[in-house]
Amino acid sequence: MLFRSDPRVEAYGEIDELNSWVGYTRSLLTPQTAKLSNELEEIQQLLFDCGHDLATPAEDERHSFEFHQKEPTAWLEQKIDTYTETVPAVKKFILPGGSQVASALHVARTTTRRAERRIVLLMQEEEINQDVLTFINRLSDYFFAAARYANYLDQQQDVLYRNSKDVFH
């Protein structure tokens, strides 16, 4: 019997919550940020793939799907690079916020980090597909870059954390 508190259920449940949040974020897109819609939909598809992979142990005969991260992660990294090169450089921490879309993307970022922690907890108990963890790790960085890009598109400036030292180079 698998309880709702089982680390496996927690891990794919966090992925499901994240997927719902990405869908909500898509509903907030403005005319300026509408260009993010297709990639956010693709991320939702990939999150379903990750959840599918996590839902059944690899050694279980019902495990019918394995997520492979190489191409999706390379795609995310290309988006991260593009958005980072487009927006003004920052050396300090920024406060999550700005436009509605950027704020929602920051929530997606922190939800992704929570999902990553749940996946690590599952990994400490049993073997998992490392490709899922790699993709989820890069996805949180994508959401940070996309949030900054959304603020840029909506002509909102990032707000620097006033007590931050230079942390980005």
Predicted regions located by residue number:
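Phosphate/pyrophosphate-binding loop motifs in nucleotide- or prenyl diphosphate-using proteins
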Residues: M1-H169
